[in-house]
């Protein structure tokens, strides 16, 4: 493992995002970042890490964005497959250009006009190292019925040990000063293809005492493509949540503690509908909880859900 970065951190903000074969949605995201940047006293830098690099039109689109927006853009190709390598490349670049804060967003999302200003405001108000914010799903027209269940596709405020806990990189701001003594790479390569490495990263920061905060005003939108606009996909996602949870729980407290939790959650399934935690539909809530528990047991028996596997054929999508 490499030594901690000791380069001084200076003032400034960079917006980072990783992309993989999503040129059109990447351009949409970048254009909305430019709108959000107008609310700031100084322009942010933009860091785009392409985890593919085979399509020259992506780099050309990023360059065109920089020219029309006037924002400084750092475009980097990361050939190592997996989301961990791409995220690490974002933070390596941020360290090289010397910014104080990094905000991250996914390439299939687009921010609200006040996104960056509200993230920075929450950081200042709470003196937080990490600030998270909501992600709101945007369904295709033929899946309007799913709006009733939108929260299953959303990212909302979470707590850990009674404190705000940011658990994913799809919408957050971080103070780079808190990372000066963190060993590199920040995101564990063991989670590069499976996903879940962002939760591992944030749990490390949380248990080392770094304060986290939440800003409801810094919301962003996420496109839900037809391939994700179904309960079949959501059940798979809940399986993945349970599967990955066992992996990071085992890192924290060891396998026996994680197995004990799985036993407890399995027994709770018999009375889970009584809790009515999902008022939209008791049955849907139970099925999703069942899939989460099923994913946990699969992990205990060595089955790792791989979210970022590369396509076997050109044009094929794998869990995206």
PLM region spans:
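Non-catalytic, C-terminal membrane-associated alpha-helical segments of glycosyltransferases
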Residues: 236-241, 253-320
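Acidic donor-binding loop at a coil-to-helix junction in glycosyltransferase catalytic cores
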Residues: 192-203
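N-proximal low-complexity "stem/linker" segments adjacent to membrane-targeting elements
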Residues: 1-35, 41
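Conserved donor NDP-sugar-binding/catalytic core segment of glycosyltransferases
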Residues: 114-145
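Short beta-strand-to-loop acidic/aromatic patch adjacent to the donor-nucleotide binding site
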Residues: 98-110
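Short, flexible, basic/aromatic active-site loop/helix in glycosyltransferases
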Residues: 133-134, 147-165
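Active-site nucleotide-sugar/metal-binding loop of Leloir-type enzymes
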Residues: 85-101
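Acidic donor-binding segment of Leloir-type glycosyltransferases
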Residues: 32-76
């Amino acid at each position: 493992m490499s030594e901690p970065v000791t380069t001084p951190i200076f003032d400034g903000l960079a917006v980072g995002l990783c992309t993989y074969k999503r040129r059109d949605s990447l351009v949409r995201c970048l254009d909305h970042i430019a709108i959000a940047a107008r609310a700031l006293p100084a322009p942010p830098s933009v860091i785009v890490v392409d985890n593919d690099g085979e399509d020259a039109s992506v780099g050309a689109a990023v360059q065109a964005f920089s020219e029309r927006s006037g924002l400084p853009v750092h475009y980097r190709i990361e050939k190592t497959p997996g989301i961990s390598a791409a995220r690490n490349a974002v933070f390596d670049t941020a360290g090289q250009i010397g910014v104080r804060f990094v905000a991250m967003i996914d390439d299939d999302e687009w921010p609200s006009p006040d996104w960056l200003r509200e993230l920075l405001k929450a950081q200042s108000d709470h003196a937080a190292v990490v600030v998270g914010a909501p992600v709101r799903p945007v369904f295709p027209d033929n899946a309007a019925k799913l709006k009733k269940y939108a929260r299953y596709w959303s990212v909302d405020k979470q707590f850990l040990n009674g404190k705000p806990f940011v658990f994913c990189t799809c919408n957050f701001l971080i103070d780079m000063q808190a990372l000066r003594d963190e060993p590199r790479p920040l995101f564990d390569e063991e989670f590069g293809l499976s996903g879940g490495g962002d939760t591992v990263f944030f749990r490390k920061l949380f248990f080392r005492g770094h304060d986290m905060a939440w800003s409801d005003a810094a919301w962003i939108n996420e496109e839900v493509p037809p391939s994700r606009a179904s309960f079949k996909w959501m059940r798979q996602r809940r399986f993945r949540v349970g599967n990955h949870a066992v992996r990071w729980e085992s890192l924290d407290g060891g396998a026996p503690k994680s197995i004990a939790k799985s036993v407890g959650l399995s027994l709770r399934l018999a009375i889970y509908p009584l809790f009515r935690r999902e008022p939209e539909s008791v049955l849907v809530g139970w099925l999703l909880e069942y899939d989460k528990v099923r994913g946990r047991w699969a992990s205990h028996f060595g089955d790792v859900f791989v979210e970022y596997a590369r396509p076997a054929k050109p044009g094929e999508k794998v869990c995206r």
